[in-house]
């Protein structure tokens, strides 16, 4: 894992841990169940030989309460390409932790996700560094770190700007890894279990 990603991940988990510990020792805001779904087109820079995909990402977020103005949520999401590009096509399913800070109608967040992914190499396949095997498909565990902003346009709807860095283990690079960078522009629908609040 790259040092920058490792540091940011540790900071995110530390933030959640500190907030939770504080909440256990003090009276905190209590909020109703938070459930939202999101989806939208995703441009993926695959990290392999300039490869690009045009994909669709969809997911669900579930939170149970806020701590000192932070909303920890469980998230699951999946990405499926509909334009595979000329190098490789990446799809994955991920789950993990998302932490949101609600600032009136603007909601920045960070997330740490883990899951499985599949890469299909276009044409006859992709040659390994040793030059003796063409790979047509590989599967890998994925670590994903990223964040974004949700902008409210109504009580139930928001526009999502999301970016991730995703680490795949692959046999077709010298390092044995590649780092994909998906960027999503999507729509969020929040279910009405209670009104949103600004902190």
Regions found by a protein language model. Name each.
Residues 1-9:
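Bacterial N-terminal signal peptides that target proteins for export
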Residues 8-18:
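Bacterial N-terminal signal peptides
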Residues 46-50, 81-87, 119-123, 170-174, ...:
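Outer-membrane beta-barrel proteins
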Residues 56-129, 140, 184-191:
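Gram-negative (and chloroplast) outer-membrane scaffold detector with strong preference
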Residues 69-71, 107, 148, 152, ...:
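Membrane-spanning beta-strand positions in outer-membrane beta-barrel proteins
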Residues 153-199:
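Predominantly the C-terminal beta-signal and adjacent terminal strand-loop region
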């Amino acid at each position: 894992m790259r040092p920058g990603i490792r540091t940011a991940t540790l900071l995110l988990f530390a933030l959640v841990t500190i907030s939770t510990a504080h909440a256990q020792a003090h009276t905190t805001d209590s909020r109703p169940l938070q459930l939202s779904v999101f989806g939208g087109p995703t441009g993926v820079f695959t990290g392999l030989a300039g490869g690009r995909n045009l994909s669709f990402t969809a997911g669900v977020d579930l939170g149970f309460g806020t701590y000192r103005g932070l909303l920890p949520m469980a998230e699951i999401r999946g990405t499926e390409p509909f334009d595979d590009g000329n190098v490789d096509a990446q799809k994955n399913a991920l789950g993990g932790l998302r932490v949101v800070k609600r600032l009136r109608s603007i909601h920045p967040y960070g997330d740490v996700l883990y899951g499985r992914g599949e890469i299909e190499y276009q044409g006859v396949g992709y040659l390994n560094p040793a030059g003796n095997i063409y790979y047509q498909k590989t599967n890998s565990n994925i670590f994903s770190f990223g964040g974004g902003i949700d902008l409210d346009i109504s009580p139930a709807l928001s526009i999502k700007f999301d970016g991730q860095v995703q680490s795949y283990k692959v046999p077709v690079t010298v390092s044995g890894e590649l780092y994909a960078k998906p960027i999503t522009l999507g729509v969020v629908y929040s279910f009405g279990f209670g009104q949103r609040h600004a902190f």
